[in-house]
């Protein structure tokens, strides 16, 4: 994580690191951590699995203007290098601030598929997608509706693309298709008897997502779910522990949201009480409304 001092004319930062080492005799493994700038010049070096780096006149990771330091970890014979962008994110009233400056999201609910490969990874198409986004003056996308490949996340770090990172929880909503029918019994989405296992699995998905993507500068917000039955009875009790878990796990304490299905309203949708940012799905020109966008 980075603690950035914006009070100076040239911001400075303190990077706090914690290296988790697993395996046989991990307690006896010596750990060395080095910090390099983007040109490869070593700025600092320290020993131990926990510590800090101080950077004066820090180069910030900015939307569409990325700067990535390199953190090199040597643990025994293993070496791992992490590109790391220094930036801050917070919500202040109606403003979404990146590096203490208001940010306006211009982009898409994207999908990670291509004509030649389907859901298979295609690195040139990833590069093409980002190039088209920049040509259209877009600056961001949501990973609708699943975590994207690590290669795409690294590319967004490098290109300064802002990402709303979403779990695989799409359509936690038994009202789709006329409602669920279990042996002739209609039940609600968050029926306490049937929904416990779903919530526990949902927690696992959040843990996996944040564990993998927590160090990506491009990720500025976590999306807990897409199009859930968030206005239904029991929705608040289902989602509040999930928001609490995400906020607990994320060392950067990024904002959290869920993206509501069209038709829900702020007075009934539980996300209006839980989310740092209200996100709404609107399908004009996609499912209905003709070609005018």
What is the meaning of each model-derived region?
Residues 1-163, 205, 218-221, 237-248, ...:
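Secreted/periplasmic carbohydrate-active enzymes, especially glycoside hydrolases
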């Amino acid at each position: 994580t980075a603690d950035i001092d914006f009070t100076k004319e040239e911001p400075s930062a303190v990077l706090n690191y914690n290296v988790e080492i697993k395996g046989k005799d991990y307690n006896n493994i010596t750990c060395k951590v080095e910090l390099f700038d983007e040109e490869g010049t070593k700025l600092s070096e320290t020993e131990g699995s926990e510590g800090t780096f101080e950077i004066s006149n820090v180069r910030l990771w900015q939307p569409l203007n990325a700067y990535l330091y390199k953190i090199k970890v040597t643990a025994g014979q293993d070496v791992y290098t992490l590109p790391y962008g220094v930036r801050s994110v917070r919500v202040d009233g109606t403003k979404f601030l990146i590096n203490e400056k208001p940010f306006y999201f211009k982009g898409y609910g994207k999908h990670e598929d291509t004509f030649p490969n389907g859901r298979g990874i295609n690195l040139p198409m990833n590069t093409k997608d980002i190039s088209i986004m920049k040509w259209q003056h877009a600056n961001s996308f949501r990973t609708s509706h699943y975590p994207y490949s690590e290669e795409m996340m690294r590319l967004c770090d490098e290109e300064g693309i802002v990402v709303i990172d979403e779990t695989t929880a799409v359509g936690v909503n038994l009202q789709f298709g006329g409602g669920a029918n279990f042996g002739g019994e209609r039940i609600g989405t968050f029926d306490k008897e049937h929904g416990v296992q779903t919530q526990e699995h949902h927690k696992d998905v959040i843990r996996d997502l944040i564990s993998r993507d927590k160090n990506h500068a491009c990720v500025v917000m976590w999306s807990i779910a897409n199009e859930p039955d968030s206005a239904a009875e029991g929705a608040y009790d289902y989602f509040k522990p999930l928001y609490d878990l995400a906020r607990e796990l994320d060392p950067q304490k990024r904002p959290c949201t869920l993206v509501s299905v069209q038709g829900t309203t702020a007075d009934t949708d539980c996300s209006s009480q839980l989310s740092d940012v209200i996100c709404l799905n609107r399908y004009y020109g996609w499912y209905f409304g003709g070609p005018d966008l």
